[in-house]
């Protein structure tokens, strides 16, 4: 986030507020995975509602939290909405495994997607930055 221009409008979408965004023009949307959350501003808001809200805000950058079975289809839709800077995280052993994990998560909400077409589209649209941690040190080991 430090690499983004300080004047950019940044929107974050997380299930737990963890990201620290230095840009003053920012909006944090927190959607809890737990019913009865203390976050009254987004209580009852679905992932699809959040995606619609984010599109209306017209951010310069969208930073999602961790991709999960619940939010993957919505995040994929958002990544295809024409916003240039969209980032999220997913746990995987390799870049190819990250693509596969993303598709598996999308299929939880959208089981009838064309897997081959979606995989090709992901390879065309997404860059995977693989980060490995060794103790307290993190390093980039691959960029696709």
Model-inferred region functions:
Residues 3-123, 133-134:
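Switch/coupling sub-region of P-loop NTPases
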Residues 122-144:
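Conserved P-loop NTPase
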